[in-house]
Amino acid sequence: MSLNTALAISLGVLGAVATWLFLGPLGGMLAIWAAFIAWGCFYHNGGKESGLQSTILGTAAGAVIAGITLKVASAGIGASLPANMWVAICVGLGVAAMVLLANVPLFASIPAQVYGFASTVAMALLPATPGSVTEASLANPVVTIILSMIVGAIFGYVSEKVAGMLMGMDHRAAAKA
């Protein structure tokens, strides 16, 4: 079995399971779209244990930096500036912070940080997101995105392992023939 075929089976089945879990038993507590972003990020970071670590740490760092950026942007500190200018300055500083954080090897995946940052801001801007970025609950978009992305990264890791097993089963069957 080719790698693409094994991945198609693994990701297809696990993607359906993840969607069912997120929309069913987990009752919409987490964001399936953020989980799929992290799942893709896992592969973007090269997979395996190192890709899992880079994805979880990078997306979490990006989410935290986004939360800080959102808090500062809405704190009224830049009230003398036009709102769009103040928000732009805050986002610029947040992005610069992410890139500088990438100097620390554990947080070197700038794309993972950007995915976490963007997902957190997107969730915070959704009209149905009532939470504050300082709450320690699932109403906080930072918390929701970090948890969703951890689950997504784990699904990525499992999908890679399952694809490897499917390829191995195919090779063992060919060896017996």
Feature roles, as predicted:
Residues 1, 163-177:
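Intrinsically disordered, low-complexity non-transmembrane regions of multi-pass membrane transporters
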Residues 1-9:
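N-terminal membrane topogenic signal
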Residues 11-24, 59, 63-75, 91-103, ...:
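Transmembrane alpha-helical segments of multi-pass membrane transport proteins and ion-pumping complexes
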Residues 12, 16, 27-46, 92-96, ...:
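Pore- and pathway-forming membrane helices of multi-pass small-molecule/ion transporters and channels
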Residues 20-35, 78-92:
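Structural signature of hydrophobic alpha-helical transmembrane segments
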Residues 32-73:
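Alpha-helical membrane segments and adjacent membrane-interface helices in multi-pass membrane proteins
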Residues 74-81, 128-139:
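Membrane-interface helix termini and inter-helical loops of multi-pass transporters
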